[in-house]
Amino acid sequence: MARPKVYVTRIIPEPGLSMLKECCDVVVHESKDWPPSREELLRNIRDKDALLCLLTDKIDAEVMDAAPNLKVISTYSVGFDHIDIPEATKRGIYVTHTPGVLTDAVAEFTVGLILAVTRRIVEADKIIRTGQWDKPWNPYFLTGPELKGKTIGLVGLGRIGVATAKRLSSFDVKILYYDIERRWDVETVIPNMEFTDLDTLLEKSDIVSIHVPLTKETYHLINEERLRKMKKTAYLINTARGPVVDTEALVKALKEGWIAGAALDVFEQEPLPPNHPLTKFDNVVLAPHIASATIEARQRMAELAARNLIAVLKGEMPPALVNKEVLKVRPLEKVKMIP
């Protein structure tokens, strides 16, 4: 049996690449920083049985047309809105992702962003570096709110939402959460948690942190109408997906003082242009989509992405299948290439 041919759109951490090379013929786009051009992607995918891609790669019908042998798309990400899932399913192409392995990293980073924006840590650093610390200590200098006793609103209570709630509970806060269903199992473990509707969460929370996937339903979930419901003393945190927040409405909210500030790791446009309006606010902390950027998490993501891809080519159920409907279109035994 011929070895499967795999295209990897970026150099990924070990042990992911080594795992693939043990059982597949692998072509790698030799860059850590830049994705392949559209032309390069279409050219390299032609004879491949499998694709390992990143969220920077748009995988649509055109790509699938260029790859008639394609059996599995393994994305090195939790989100998969960069892949046309219905199209892949229709063609019998398995799509997998990497949930769970970056949960702790993103939850830790979320707490870090909350502290950074509320306690004005980035603003303080900038003041020292630009020579503006030119006055004696005074009791009002760079003050911000404590977390203790505050109400934290979590929009979405999946793996990352739960992990964030666990960490925040140690600050002696009240946690409101909104999700498509009530999580009794979590409420029994984490103290001071309350299930509520989205509008109530926005109206009562001192900090609103977003933890939902990007879908048609969550696109611009946080829009002008909902931003206006937040307290003027509240902060918005987003480590989920950029388009969940209407950027134009958020800029307006910050300019007009509807909210106290924001901390963002994701954006509707990535990379964010250096002259973007969001870069002009001292009460906004910005990060370049690095919430999962721990050494350990990125290694686990690579390993899971490789395991997903290899499992499908072995005719086995992958650890994290996105489109379960594909099993009815093309059973796993029909895509088996690795003994």
Swiss-Prot record:
Active site: R241, E270, H289 (proton donor)
Catalytic EC class: oxidoreductase
Pfam families registered for this protein in UniProt: 2-Hacid_dh (PF00389), 2-Hacid_dh_C (PF02826)
Subcellular location: Cytoplasm
UniProt GO molecular function: glyoxylate reductase (NADH) activity; glyoxylate reductase (NADPH) activity; hydroxypyruvate reductase [NAD(P)H] activity; NAD binding
Protein residues bound to NADP(+): L157, G158, R159, I160, T239, A240, R241, H289, I290, A291
Gene3D superfamilies: NAD(P)-binding Rossmann-like Domain
Keywords: Cytoplasm, NAD, Oxidoreductase
A GO-annotated cellular component: cytosol
Claim: Hydrolase is one of the keywords in the record: no
EC code: 1.1.1.26
InterPro entries reported for this sequence: D-isomer_2-hydroxyacid_DH (IPR050223), D-isomer_2_OHA_DH_cat_dom (IPR006139), D-isomer_DH_CS (IPR029753), D-isomer_DH_NAD-bd (IPR006140), Glyoxylate_reductase_GyaR (IPR023519), NAD(P)-bd_dom_sf (IPR036291)
Swiss-Prot/TrEMBL catalytic activity: glycolate + NAD(+) = glyoxylate + NADH + H(+)
PANTHER family for this protein: 2-HYDROXYACID DEHYDROGENASE-RELATED, GLYOXYLATE_HYDROXYPYRUVATE REDUCTASE B
Subunit relationships: Homodimer.
Family the UniProt entry places it in: Belongs to the D-isomer specific 2-hydroxyacid dehydrogenase family. GyaR subfamily.
Identification of the protein by name: Glyoxylate reductase
Organism: Thermofilum pendens (strain DSM 2475 / Hrk 5)
